Amino acid sequence: MSVPTMAWMMLLLGLLAYGSGVDSQTVVTQEPSFSVSPGGTVTLTCGLSSGSVSTSYYPSWYQQTPGQAPRTLIYSTNTRSSGVPDRFSGSILGNKAALTITGAQADDESDYYCVLYMGSGI
């Protein structure tokens, strides 16, 4: 099974970082894609070009399949949304937010997005 284009939103940093003291040149670091065999485990990460991601950024993860609205999988680092299977888990891994899919299934083939809360100056 191929999990294509594990794309992450560029976080709309100009908007989300407004008034937060985050440099407007900060960008998200990401892997472009992953492949995983059915039943396998894959970990996707979401980092910043400068600084570390921590729980204070309240990392959230979204899954989107073509033609569908994004579905919230994880919010506040590691809280699963209602109805999300426990094979999806969120964490902080080193200095990045991480989404781990354990026991991957064919219908997990999707785009996955990470969103970080960068400040409250809006």
Swiss-Prot record:
Occurrences of domain Ig-like (ranges): 25-122
Coiled coil: none
Keyword Zinc carried by entry: no
Main subcellular location: secreted
Region span, Framework-3: 79-114
Chain segments carrying region Complementarity-determining-2: 76-78
Compartmental location: Secreted; Cell membrane
Region (Complementarity-determining-3): 115-122
Signal sequence segment: 1-24
PROSITE patterns: IG_LIKE
Pfam families reported in the protein's UniProt record: V-set
Recorded GO CC terms: extracellular region; immunoglobulin complex; plasma membrane
Framework-2: annotated segments: 59-75
GO biological process per UniProt: adaptive immune response; immune response
Record region (Framework-1): 25-49
Keywords in alphabetical order: Adaptive immunity, Cell membrane, Disulfide bond, Immunity, Immunoglobulin, Immunoglobulin domain, Membrane, Secreted, Signal
Keyword DNA-binding carried by entry: no
Region (Complementarity-determining-1): 50-58
Disulfide-bond pairs as recorded: 46-114
General function of this protein: V region of the variable domain of immunoglobulin light chains that participates in the antigen recognition. Immunoglobulins, also known as antibodies, are membrane-bound or secreted glycoproteins produced by B lymphocytes. In the recognition phase of humoral immunity, the membrane-bound immunoglobulins serve as receptors which, upon binding of a specific antigen, trigger the clonal expansion and differentiation of B lymphocytes into immunoglobulins-secreting plasma cells.
Quaternary structure and interacting proteins, as annotated: Immunoglobulins are composed of two identical heavy chains and two identical light chains; disulfide-linked.
Descriptive protein name: Immunoglobulin lambda variable 8-61
